From Swiss-Prot:
GO terms for cellular component: cytoplasm; exosome (RNase complex). GO terms for biological process: CUT catabolic process; exonucleolytic trimming to generate mature 3'-end of 5.8S rRNA from tricistronic rRNA transcript (SSU-rRNA, 5.8S rRNA, LSU-rRNA); poly(A)-dependent snoRNA 3'-end processing; RNA catabolic process; U4 snRNA 3'-end processing. It holds the Pfam family KH_6. Residues 59-128 form the S1 motif domain. SUPFAM superfamilies: Eukaryotic type KH-domain (KH-domain type I) (SSF54791), Nucleic acid-binding proteins (SSF50249), Ribosomal L27 protein-like (SSF110324). The keyword Protein transport does not apply. Keywords: Cytoplasm, Exosome, RNA-binding. Coiled coil: none annotated. Belongs to the RRP4 family. This is Exosome complex component Rrp4.
């Protein structure tokens, strides 16, 4: 069953203690303050917005794109209303001003952490972590920031399944930018899946839906291959391997949360 879409002013509950994100209380009742999906939990009633800009929070890990290089800072577009600032002191090693364009130049994509956000929305970024680095391969796909939780899935169920079924590396930035890398055909398939997740984020059973979509696309791809290629492929794949693959698919199907 699909989740309920609400608009500002819709009545959500008469238990004011459960008021959560995207709601307001009036006359001892909880109402929606956003256009989004109703989120009902045991102790909270909230609204997940259907759309909206990324609002940075401290310690968010995001993907930024360098837009300006100054003598002491890199300025990056982080898909927020305000740009982010990476000071040279936040780079992992000492950097001279003349080196800065050689290290990170305009157009480069980088995984960074939001170090600080002040009241005037000055956003400071950091790169002092082994997991934070410049992206040299792959490509970036952008989705609405509010859809990021659906790309990750409950307990990481969606992203784990995407990695397994597409054979791609994936990193999801909290600002809605997603880095993907792999073979060209796998990247194309994953991009389609991400667009489908974004378009159907409000639907229930999304992980299973995307899993079936990927299997169907793989089947279409296999059927469209030349006969000669299929013959070669058949000699390389034993029955045991095929059975093992199907067993993995069944295990994934059982582990996935059908309501996620």
């Amino acid at each position: 069953m699909d989740k309920k879409i609400v608009i500002p002013g819709d009545l959500l509950s008469d238990d004011v203690k459960k008021s959560g994100y995207g709601t307001y209380v009036k006359n001892d009742k909880i109402y929606s303050s956003l256009c989004g999906i109703e989120s009902l939990k045991e102790d909270k009633v909230g609204v997940i917005p259907l759309a909206g800009a990324y609002i940075p929070s401290v310690n968010d890990v995001v993907i930024g794109v360098v837009i300006v290089v100054t003598p002491s800072n890199w300025i990056l577009d982080i898909a927020a209303p305000y740009d982010g600032l990476l000071h040279v002191s936040e780079y992992p090693r000492r950097v001279e001003s003349r080196e800065m364009p050689e290290i990170l130049d305009v157009g480069d994509s980088v995984i960074l952490r939001v170090r600080d956000v002040d009241s005037s929305m000055k956003i400071e970024l950091a790169l002092r972590d082994p997991n934070l680095h410049k992206l040299r391969t792959g490509q970036i796909v952008e989705v609405e920031p509010v859809k990021v939780p659906r790309v990750i899935g409950h307990g990481g169920s969606m992203i784990s399944m995407l990695k397994k079924e597409t054979n791609c590396s994936i990193f999801v930035g909290q600002n809605g930018r997603i880095w993907i890398d792999g073979k060209d055909e796998d990247i194309e398939l994953l991009s389609k899946a991400l667009r489908k997740i974004e378009a159907e984020a409000q639907r229930s059973g999304l992980t299973d839906r995307i899993y079936n979509f990927l299997k169907n696309e793989r089947m279409k791809e296999k059927e469209s291959k030349p006969v000669e290629f299929l013959k070669n492929e058949k000699t390389d794949v034993s029955v045991a391997k095929e059975d093992h693959s199907e067993d993995i698919y069944r295990k994934i199907d059982v582990l996935l949360d059908p309501k996620n």
